[in-house]
C-alpha cells in the first residue's frame, strides 16, 4: 500500500517547539485518519531545527465502501393515512433516496423510519489534501508569529512543503495572504554542509535522502548520536560527561548533523564553586561539563574541559573549539571577578541594598518582604514549639535569605540565587544550618526537584511562599486559567509538599489568617483575601491528592468536603491529617473494606440531615434521652454509641483511622436491626420528641464517621 510524506520546511524553529509539535501530531494525526476510516500500517514523526515531518506508511488508496444507516422522523410523522408527509419527503431528499427505500422499525422510543445509504469511499489523496493544511495550521505553542502578509501564525516562516504520495507529488498549496507555498518533492539539506535543494524520489526514501545531505531527521537518532559522541570524547579526556536531561533535550533540536567538540580552560578557574562553572557551561553556553572519574571523586570534581555539540563542519573542530574556549574563558573570568568582589564583604552587609530592589510596586521592596518573611517564620516557630537555638537560626536564615540577590554574581547569573547565598553565608561565618537554609528555602523549585532537608530551609521556605501568596491575593491578582505570573500555584504546591515531606504539624489556615490581617493593616484600602485563599489552597490540595498521591476524586471530595466549610477548615488546619485520611480511604477501597461500613453510614446520614444535631457532637449522653426509647434496638444503638466515643477520639488523636472503621463495622448489625430488625423503629415518628431522639442517634453515628470523611461524597463501588 502507498506511503505519504509531509515535510514542513521553516526557518530555525525554537528548540522546545520541535518536540511540542511532534507530540501534537502524534496525538492528532492518527485520530484524524481514523475518523476518515483510514488505518495506516505505521506512522513515523521527524523534526529538526528547520523542518517538521511525518511519514505515514501503508495507507489504503481509498476508503472502504460502506453502508450508513440514518434514522429519520417517527413513523406517525413520516406517514399520514399511509402516504408520505412533507417531513418524510424532506428527509429522503436530504439523504438522496426515495420514499420507497425507507423502512419502519420498532425502537425503545416507538416506530421510526430508517434508510440505508451506500457510501462510496473517497480517494485517500483527496482526504489528505483536506487534512494536511489542518495538521499544519492547528499546531499550538508559545511565541507564534505572523509571517508573510496573511493571518497564518507559526513559530517561524514556512519556506517549503514536501507532500509525496509514494513517488508522486500530492498537489497542495498553503496560502497566507499574497504568500503562497506550493508543495513539491524538493527539500533542503544542511544549511552549511549541503545547502542545495534535495529531490526526494519517493516518500519512503525521505530519511535516507536527507542523511546524504547531512541532515538526520530523527530526533531519537540524533539523541543517540550525541550521547555516544559525548561519552566517547569524555573518555578520551579521562573523565565522564555530565549530561543534564534538559540540556540534552534542547541540543537535540538545535542541530541537524551533530558533532561533539571538546574544549578546555585554565585549571585556575576550578577554584570557583562548581555550581558557578556548571551554570556558565550548561545554562549560558549549552556545554556539557566533564568531571573526574574514579571512587576518589566523591565531590564530583570537575575537570578543566567542556564538550559542545556543533552543527557545522566536523572537520573544523579545532576552529570551533577555539571560538568556544574564548567565550567560556571570558565568562569564567567575569565570574571569578564577581566571586572575589562578593566575598570581600559579609553577606549581612548586602541587606541595605535590598531596599533598592522592588518586589512589587504596591508591596514594597525585597527588604520589606524579608521583614514579612521573618515575622511569618516566627509564627511557624511558635506553632512548632521550637527551642531558642532553632528560633535563632531560623531568624538568621530569614534575614539573610534574599541577601545574595544584590551580589554581583547573582545579578549576572540569576539561576544561582540561594546557591551563592549558601556559599557567602559560610564564608561570612554563619552556621551550616543557616547557610543550608538560605539555599533550601527555594526548594522545591519545580515538580521533580529535591525537597529541603533542613528545618531552617523548610520554615523559611514556607514563610516566603505564604507571604507571596497572601500579598498577591490581597492585591486581587488571583491566578487564572491563562495566567499565573507570580507562580502562586507552584508556591502553594510547594507549601503542601514541604509540609507533607517534613511531617510538619502546622496550621496553614492560622498562618493565612494572620498574614491576611497583617496585609489589611498595612493596606487599609484593601479587603482580606482569606476566603479566596481558602478556595485556592483547597483546589491545590485536591489536585495534589489526585495527581501525586493517586487518590480517587470522590475520596478527595470526601476528605475536603464539597462546599463544606467545616471540612475546609479542618483540612487547612492539619495538612498531615487530610493526607492520611485520604490515603486510608483509598486503602480500604482497594481492599473493599469500605463496603462493610458504606451502607450503614450513608443510610444513617441521609436520614440524619432531617434532624438538627450539630455535626461536631459525638457524646450520646448530651443529646439522647433514654426515657423516650420504645424499642430495645434504640437502647442497643445508644450503648454502642457510648462505647464508640473513646475509640473515635483515639483514632482522631493518633490518626489511626483503622480503629474507627473497625468499630463502625462492628456497629453495623446494631444499626441494621434499628432499621429492619424485629425491634425496628419508624424514625420519623409522629411524636416529635421521639423523632428527634431517633434522628439524634443517627446523627451521632454520622458525626463519628465524619471524623474520617463525608461518606455522602463517596461514590458506591
Curated annotation (Swiss-Prot):
Bridged cysteine pairs (disulfide): none
UniProt KW keywords: Aminoacyl-tRNA synthetase, ATP-binding, Cytoplasm, Ligase, Nucleotide-binding, Protein biosynthesis
Reaction(s) catalysed by this chain's protein: tRNA(Gly) + glycine + ATP = glycyl-tRNA(Gly) + AMP + diphosphate
Primary localization: cytoplasm
Gene Ontology biological process terms in this record: arginyl-tRNA aminoacylation; glycyl-tRNA aminoacylation
Enzyme class: ligase
Localization terms from the record: Cytoplasm
GO cellular component: cytosol
InterPro entries: DALR_anticod-bd, Gly-tRNA-synth_bsu, Gly-tRNA-synth_heterodimer
Any GO molecular function: ATP binding
Enzyme Commission no: 6.1.1.14
Stretches that traverse the bilayer: none
ATP-binding as UniProt keyword: yes
Family according to the record: Belongs to the class-II aminoacyl-tRNA synthetase family.
NCBIfam families recorded: glyS
Subunit structure: Tetramer of two alpha and two beta subunits.
Protein name stated in the entry: Glycine--tRNA ligase beta subunit
Amino acid at each position: 500500500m502507498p506511503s505519504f510524506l509531509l515535510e514542513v520546511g521553516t526557518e530555525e524553529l525554537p528548540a522546545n517547539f520541535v518536540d511540542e509539535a511532534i507530540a501534537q501530531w502524534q496525538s492528532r494525526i492518527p485520530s484524524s485518519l481514523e475518523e476518515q476510516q483510514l488505518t495506516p500500517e505505521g506512522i513515523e514523526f521527524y523534526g529538526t531545527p528547520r523542518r517538521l515531518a511525518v511519514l505515514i506508511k501503508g495507507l489504503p488508496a481509498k476508503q472502504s465502501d460502506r453502508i450508513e444507516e440514518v434514522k429519520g422522523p417517527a413513523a406517525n410523522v413520516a406517514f399520514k393515512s399511509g402516504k408520505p408527509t412533507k417531513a418524510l419527503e424532506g428527509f429522503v431528499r436530504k439523504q438522496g433516496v426515495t420514499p420507497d427505500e425507507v423502512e419502519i422499525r420498532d425502537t425503545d422510543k416507538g416506530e421510526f423510519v430508517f434508510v440505508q445509504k451506500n457510501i462510496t469511499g473517497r480517494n485517500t489523496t483527496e482526504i489528505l489534501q483536506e487534512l494536511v493544511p489542518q495538521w499544519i495550521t492547528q499546531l499550538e505553542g508559545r511565541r507564534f508569529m505572523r509571517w508573510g502578509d496573511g493571518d497564518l501564525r507559526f513559530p517561524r516562516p514556512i519556506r517549503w512543503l514536501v507532500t509525496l504520495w509514494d513517488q508522486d507529488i500530492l498537489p497542495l498549496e498553503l496560502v497566507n495572504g499574497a504568500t503562497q507555498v506550493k508543495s513539491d518533492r524538493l527539500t533542503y539539506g544542511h544549511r552549511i554542509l549541503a545547502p542545495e535543494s534535495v529531490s526526494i524520489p519517493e516518500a519512503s526514501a525521505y530519511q535516507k535522502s536527507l542523511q546524504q545531505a547531512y541532515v538526520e531527521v530523527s530526533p531519537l537518532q540524533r539523541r543517540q548520536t550525541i550521547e555516544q559522541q559525548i561519552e566517547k570524547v569524555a573518555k578520551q579526556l579521562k573523565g565522564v560527561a555530565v549530561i543534564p536531561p534538559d540540556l540534552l533535550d534542547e541540543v537535540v533540536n538545535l542541530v541537524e548533523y551533530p558533532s561533539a567538540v571538546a574544549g578546555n580552560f585554565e585549571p585556575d578557574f576550578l577554584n570557583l564553586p562548581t555550581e558557578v562553572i556548571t551554570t556558565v557551561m550548561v545554562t549560558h553556553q549549552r556545554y556539557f561539563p566533564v568531571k573526574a572519574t574514579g571512587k576518589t571523586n566523591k565531590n564530583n570534581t570537575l575537570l578543566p574541559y567542556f564538550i559542545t555539540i556543533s552543527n557545522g563542519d566536523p572537520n573544523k573542530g579545532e576552529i570551533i573549539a577555539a571560538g568556544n574556549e574564548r567565550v567560556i574563558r571570558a565568562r569564567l573570568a567575569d565570574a571569578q571577578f564577581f566571586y572575589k568582589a562578593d566575598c570581600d564583604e559579609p553577606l549581612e552587609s548586602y541587606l541595605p541594598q535590598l531596599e533598592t530592589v522592588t518586589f512589587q510596586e504596591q508591596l514594597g521592596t525585597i527588604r520589606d518582604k524579608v521583614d514579612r518573611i521573618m515575622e511569618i517564620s516566627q509564627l511557624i516557630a511558635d506553632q512548632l514549639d521550637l527551642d531558642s537555638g532553632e528560633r535563632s537560626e531560623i531568624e538568621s536564615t530569614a534575614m539573610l535569605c534574599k541577601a545574595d540577590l544584590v551580589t554581583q554574581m547573582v545579578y549576572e547569573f540569576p539561576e544561582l540565587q540561594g546557591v551563592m547565598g549558601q556559599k557567602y553565608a559560610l564564608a561570612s561565618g554563619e552556621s551550616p544550618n543557616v547557610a543550608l537554609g538560605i539555599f533550601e528555602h527555594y526548594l522545591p523549585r519545580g515538580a521533580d526537584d529535591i525537597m529541603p532537608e533542613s528545618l531552617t530551609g523548610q520554615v523559611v521556605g514556607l514563610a516566603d511562599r505564604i507571604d507571596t501568596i497572601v500579598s498577591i491575593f490581597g492585591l486581587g491578582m488571583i491566578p487564572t486559567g491563562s495566567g499565573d505570573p507570580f507562580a502562586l500555584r507552584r508556591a502553594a504546591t510547594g507549601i503542601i509538599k514541604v509540609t507533607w515531606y517534613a511531617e510538619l504539624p502546622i496550621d496553614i489556615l492560622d498562618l493565612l489568617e494572620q498574614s491576611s490581617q497583617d496585609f489589611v493593616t498595612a493596606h487599609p484600602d484593601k479587603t482580606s483575601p482569606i476566603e479566596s485563599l481558602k478556595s485556592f489552597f483547597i483546589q491545590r490540595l485536591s489536585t495534589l491528592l489526585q495527581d501525586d498521591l493517586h487518590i480517587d476524586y470522590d475520596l478527595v471530595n470526601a476528605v475536603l468536603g464539597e462546599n463544606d466549610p467545616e471540612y475546609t477548615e479542618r483540612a487547612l488546619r492539619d495538612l498531615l491529617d487530610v493526607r492520611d485520611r485520604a490515603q486510608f480511604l483509598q486503602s480500604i477501597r482497594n481492599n473493599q473494606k469500605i463496603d462493610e461500613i458504606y451502607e450503614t453510614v450513608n443510610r444513617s446520614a441521609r436520614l440524619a440531615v432531617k434532624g438538627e444535631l450539630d455535626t461536631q457532637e459525638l457524646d450520646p449522653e448530651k443529646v439522647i434521652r433514654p426515657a423516650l426509647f420504645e424499642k430495645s434496638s434504640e437502647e442497643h444503638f445508644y450503648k454502642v454509641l457510648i462505647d464508640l466515643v473513646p475509640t473515635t477520639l483515639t483514632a482522631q488523636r493518633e490518626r489511626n483511622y483503622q480503629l474507627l472503621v473497625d468499630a463502625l463495622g462492628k456497629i453495623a448489625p446494631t444499626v441494621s436491626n434499628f432499621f429492619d430488625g424485629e425491634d425496628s423503629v419508624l424514625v420519623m415518628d409522629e411524636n416529635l420528641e421521639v423523632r428527634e431522639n431517633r434522628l439524634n442517634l443517627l446523627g451521632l453515628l454520622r458525626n463519628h464517621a465524619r471524623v474520617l470523611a463525608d461518606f455522602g461524597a463517596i461514590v458506591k463501588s
